[in-house]
Amino acid sequence: MILANSNDPDSVRLARHYAAKRAVPPGNLIALPMPLVETISWPEFIGSVYQPLQDWLVARGWIDAIGPALTDNTGRKRYSVFGHRISYLVVCRGVPLRVGHEPRFYVDEPGFASRPMFRTNQGAVDSELTLLAYGVYNINGWVPNPRFGVEQARLLESDRVVLVTRLDGPSYEDAAGLVDHAIEAETTGLIGRFYINVRGPHPDGERWLDQTAAQLANLGFDGDVDRTDNNLPASARFDAPVLYFGWYAQDLSGPMALPGFRFPPGAIVLHIHSFSAQTLRSAGTGWCGPLVARGVTATFGNVFEPYLQLTIEPQMLMRALSQGRNLGDSAYYATPALSWQTIVIGDPLYRPFAVSLDAQLANVGALPPALAPYVLLRKARLLEREGKKAEAVAVYRAVLRNTALEPGRRAIILRAAADAAHAAGDGSRAAAWEKELVASGAPPLADGNK
């Protein structure tokens, strides 16, 4: 299902663009008149978004429910819900982003009343819409996600959750790019390096990011893990950033913030910060809006303070994605709380690992010259991890035979290749590569998985 704001022509245009790209039937698009602002009140949300959408879905059999005309204190109908058949709900730019706290609707929820940070009903519109088929729930605090960490999400409780993602950004073109980049990346698979900025004030977050780094290294991706007390400097190495995970900076920074920077197709970025998605209309404030403006394919954010333990866990996200699952399934596998602050930005059907490394290697000659070395480098890294040192050196030789390699990238490969040759006991080849590296004038920066 695709949801658009009929008061915003670009919202409807975006919905039609997505439907055309993913072959979604026209009857699965619903456009409702909504306020043209990012933040709305609970009465506005119930009156213009939640209830009209739920009624539409019930009337057409997308949600299996019956119920009288009775309503709760917020104005929601008290449907008895038995399930739904909505694969994903894609919310388009123009649909409001977040719901402000409404004191009139606040009722203490057992377990939350003693914790002031949870005594609120503010939240993300998308997160509230995940519970369209849940039945009436207390809007105060948060609802545990029954899909969190569930490998086979076919239990009755899990089937009450609607998987919601958003196509949104500073401009129509930015938002449309989310699906365009996803489809482009699915033709080649995920190609590039990872970058992880571990610094932060909480042990849980550091543990998550350490686990994510280990997962990506086990998948063969070359990458850097920064453990300094600062964010990545603008001068940091940042070639082919197809995967980035970090936290605790208020606004986009480092190489990503440089003028003209663009992410490669397929890039997945998660920066953990309390208000990273407070607005999606700015290309310079926060994280999510600027990331989408710079061509990211999938990202995640928080519209209000979520508290660390209730945010998307990056290591769980990568676990699901690397198993071949799509963005929609993976994001909710990694999200502990609903009716809360987190949103998922991107095409729910995007499968970054739909193309295997073996398939990438078989097609490496057809890849753009700037991408091919990263596929071979990933294969070499896997061989090194398996102890197949001589085979890894052979792959590095194949990479370095590419005369079209940009000098900076060639120097990066030379460093890794020389280390691999030393490990394989091939001193003469290591010396030759080191000699070429010195002659190139490349700075002596450390390479690989720091």
What are these regions (language model features)?
Residues 431, 439-450:
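Terminal, low-structured helical/coil segments at or just beyond the last alpha-helical repeat
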Residues 133-136, 418, 441:
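Generic low-complexity, intrinsically disordered sequence content enriched
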Residues 375, 413, 446-448:
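The tetratricopeptide repeat
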Residues 400-406, 436-444:
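Solenoid-like repeat scaffolds
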